[in-house]
Swiss-Prot record:
SMART domains: EFG_C, EFG_IV. Its main location: cytoplasm. CDD domains: EF-G, EFG_III, EFG_mtEFG1_IV, EFG_mtEFG_C, EFG_mtEFG_II. It comes from Hyphomonas neptunium (strain ATCC 15444). Disulfide bonds: none annotated. This is Elongation factor G. GO terms for molecular function: GTP binding; GTPase activity; translation elongation factor activity. One of its GO terms (cellular component) is cytoplasm. It is found in: Cytoplasm. NCBIfam families: EF-G, PRK12740.1-5, small_GTP. Catalyzes the GTP-dependent ribosomal translocation step during translation elongation. During this step, the ribosome changes from the pre-translocational (PRE) to the post-translocational (POST) state as the newly formed A-site-bound peptidyl-tRNA and P-site-bound deacylated tRNA move to the P and E sites, respectively. Catalyzes the coordinated movement of the two tRNA molecules, the mRNA and conformational changes in the ribosome. One of its GO terms (biological process) is ribosome disassembly. PANTHER family: RIBOSOME-RELEASING FACTOR 2, MITOCHONDRIAL, TRANSLATION ELONGATION FACTOR G-RELATED. The gene is fusA. Residues 8-294 form the tr-type G domain.
Length: 707
């Protein structure tokens, strides 16, 4: 099967923003106007096509990135297509802070992005986070200032905020006509034409007019600024401009495209997706200014097993190159089983092909291959460079793995995922639930690398760990709905850690004799605290066979098991080095198990000799509040052991930044609502681990030990 659409007509992009900026509503309009959806779904009535999980429809937020393939013919008058069809692969991403990992995974495989802003709120905290993520992946973007029909919407304030908050250079290519209830449409500053939506046909048609006299001066001023920015992208254009010759419309579009792809500036558009105004010109903006796979530099990968990760193997958007792709999301489908969303960077892949998972060194075979539309599928037999497809039935491949031609192996990416900061105990109600829960948790963990499942060795409880309360709520809900698990759920707990405060030398002997073969192992270990983030390091400095080589793995295993159960309160001990310096063995009574038990015993002695400390997650909290409540908010944050970092004006409100222990942030949302009469909002992100004050640590240890 030959490629149907040339690569220059592909656009792989995501719609990203802060929660409630209107992402899913905008995507619904896109699907409607591109003909993928026959009616418009609304988030507030639970009918949105992209929000396909039940919890998403109930909560009105998007949790997982749903991928959709659709097509767009660039148009200006609403009836005549000005170009052949463009193929859009769209990822709709969540804006809630607990699901930042989904955004991260999406950005790793996209070529461009549409950033949505709420016309009233402007650049919000999660927008800044996502913007920084997009900067890290060098993703060109355009901005759509949405909700221009809302009370208090201010396009020019949003433009100023983009400059102040993100450091980017905004390049408005539109200017709104009216705002709030008076929003009519916008002026296209490239063509100097008004686009006005008047009819009752769900925004499917609009009227093009010359710019009205009352707005002409402002529009001309803004266009002049746009042209000045654009001509800087080309020496010849700049020279002509200085001689008094402005670029014509196609040349101006080409210059804006060049600047956008080079990340020199960001085109700004405006409208209201909910009121069906401005969505089609935004789609034209995707065509005009966002990259095709051909505009993106070749992806540089490295040879599997190369510890230096020297990136010298190029893979570019070319069907003739060896096949290479990146698995960026796992999803469980009730009919097709496990679906692995994959971005194909080079070459092509056919149904039945065998390929290599270069990350794990395992062979896989393509069973079924589908093109996704939210949670509906179109089965296909072949996929090409630039495609985003879902592969069914892969056994070994998980998020972040590279899949490639076995004859030309390459690793494209090593994704890193954050450590969970909150945990909850979950107990199945019956034996049947136990089995279902085990399967369910395994599948959910495969889908979401920021979710971990562990067993507490002492209590036997299953512990779920995640990025926030909402994150775990959703997963527990999915256990009930998708896997029919009935379980008792504990209270959310903070994921504390422990560390040692000073170096210690420990000499420990394990000896057991009770008839028959005994057990004997003696080890000398030096324990040292390390910098935060170093993890656990084991070093063998044995010389002369004091401990035979075959027993040393037993020492490491014993330490690895013991550190998970802690020294003070049962929390994992991290950031330390254990060096095995000496020991002794018995020809008959020594074994790997004996050395493992000795290592556990030696580790326990750190409680008295290593000055263990309790560590807690510290969250970066931002509260945006009307000034009237600022004193109360700061006082309340201080009472939660918060450290105020600073404050700044945010429109008519004030944004306060603080570092606060996570343990003191449970239930904060209702407290803040009461304190500010519902007018203040907050966001919080994990920042770092810090030592718990001694008095607080003592209380936690007593609670855990029940004394």
């Amino acid at each position: 099967m030959a490629r149907e659409y040339p690569l220059e007509r592909y656009r792989n992009f995501g719609i990203i923003a802060h929660i409630d900026a209107g992402k899913t509503t905008t995507t619904e309009r896109v699907l409607y106007y591109t003909g993928k959806s026959h009616k418009i779904g609304e988030v507030h009535d639970g009918a949105a096509t992209m929000d396909w999980m039940e919890q998403e429809q109930e909560r009105g937020i998007t949790i997982t990135s749903a991928a959709t393939t659709t097509f767009w013919e660039r148009t200006e008058d609403g009836s005549t297509a000005l170009s052949p069809k463009y193929r859009f692969n769209i990822i709709d991403t969540p804006g809630h802070v607990d699901f930042t990992i989904e955004v991260e995974r999406s950005l790793a495989v996209l070529d461009g992005a549409v950033v949505l802003l709420d016309g009233n709120a402007g650049v919000e905290p999660q927008t800044e986070t996502v913007w920084r993520q997009a900067d890290r992946y060098k993703v060109p973007r355009i901005v759509f200032v949405n909700k221009m029909d809302k009370t208090g919407a201010d396009f020019f304030n949003c433009v100023a905020m983009i400059k102040d908050r993100t450091g980017a250079t905004p390049a408005p290519i539109q200017m709104p006509i009216g705002s709030e209830t008076e929003l009519e449409g916008h002026i296209d500053l490239v063509t100097m034409t008004e686009w006005v939506w008047e009819g009752e046909d769900l925004g499917a048609s609009w009227v093009l007019r010359p710019v009205r006299e009352s707005l002409k001066a402002k529009a001309e001023e803004m266009r002049a600024h746009l042209v000045e920015l654009a001509v800087e992208m080309d020496d010849a254009a700049m020279e002509a401009f200085l001689e008094g010759k402005e670029p014509d419309v196609p040349a101006l579009r080409a210059l804006i495209r060049k600047g956008t792809l080079a990340l020199k500036f960001v085109p700004i558009l405006c409208g209201s997706a909910f009121k069906n105004k401005g969505v089609q010109p935004m789609l034209n903006g995707v065509v005009d200014y966002l990259p095709s796979p051909l505009d993106v530099p070749a992806y540089l990968g490295f040879k599997p097993g190369d510890e230096t990760e020297t990136r010298d193997i190029p893979r570019s958007a070319d069907d003739g190159q060896p096949f290479a792709g990146l698995a960026f999301k796992i999803m469980n489908d009730p009919y097709m089983g496990t679906l692995t969303f994959t971005r194909i960077y080079s070459g092509k892949l056919s149904k039945g092909d065998a390929f290599l998972n270069a990350t794990k060194g395992k062979k896989e075979r393509v069973g079924r291959m589908v093109m996704m539309h939210a949670n509906k599928q179109d089965e296909i037999t072949e996929a090409f460079a630039g495609d985003i497809v879902a592969l069914a039935g892969l056994k070994e491949t998980t998020t972040g793995d590279t899949v490639c031609d076995p004859a030309q192996p390459v690793v494209l990416e090593t994704m890193t995922f954050p450590q969970p900061v909150i945990e909850i105990a979950v107990e199945p109600k019956t034996k049947a639930d136990q089995e279902k829960m085990s399967v369910g948790l395994q599948r959910l963990a495969a889908e979401d690398p920021s979710f971990r499942v562990e067993t507490n060795f002492e209590s036997g409880q299953t512990i779920m760990k995640g990025m926030g309360e909402l994150h775990l709520d959703i997963l527990i809900d999915r256990l009930r709905r998708e896997f029919k698990v009935e379980a008792n759920i504990g209270q959310p707990q903070v994921a504390y850690r422990e560390k040692i405060g000073r170096a210690a030398d420990i000499d420990y002997t394990h000896k057991k004799q009770s008839g028959g073969t005994g057990q004997f192992a003696r080890i000398k270990l030096t324990f040292e605290p390390l910098e935060a983030g170093s993890g656990f390091q084991f070093v063998s400095a044995i010389v002369g066979g004091a401990v035979p080589k075959e027993y040393i793995p037993g020492v490491q295993k014993g330490l690895e098991m013991a550190k998970e159960n802690g020294l003070l309160a049962g929390y994992p001990v991290t950031d330390f080095r254990a060096t095995l310096t000496d020991g002794a063995f018995h020809d008959v009574d020594s074994s790997v198990l004996a050395f493992e038990i000795a290592a556990r015993g030696a580790f326990r002695e750190l409680k008295g000799k290593g000055d263990p400390r309790l560590m807690e997650p510290i969250m970066k909290v931002e509260v945006v509040t009307p000034e009237d409540y600022m004193g109360d908010v700061i006082g309340d944050l201080n009472s939660r052991r918060g450290q105020i970092q600073g404050s700044e004006a945010r429109g008519i409100a004030t944004a306060i930044t603080a570092m606060v222990p996570l343990v003191n942030m449970f239930g904060y949302v209702s407290n803040l609502r009461g304190m500010s009469q519902g007018r203040a909002q907050f966001t919080m992100f994990f920042d770092h681990y810090d030592e718990v004050p001694r008095a607080e640590a003592q209380k936690i240890i007593q609670e855990v030990s029940g004394s």
